[in-house]
């Protein structure tokens, strides 16, 4: 799992970064959060090998976004969410590893 909070990137830039990581490492889960003033975007990308292990970007992004008071969804390989509570981004990122770990354990 690669995860980071970035500043000032729009949703398109987040998607591009996630796609590049996913294409380079099919066993990887990438969770990127970009804060912009009073809102944030959360992007999750899951490579093919990671999907084969039961991981789903749509499910991951929903759970991560809930920690930050946001909502989102998407496909098994890529999903996005948004939140207006930028004060909880660190909590969301910290929860991400546990969320992925729980999905692998199921």
Report the location of each language-model feature.
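Glycine-rich, acidic loop segments that terminate in or are immediately followed by a histidine
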Residues: 2-106
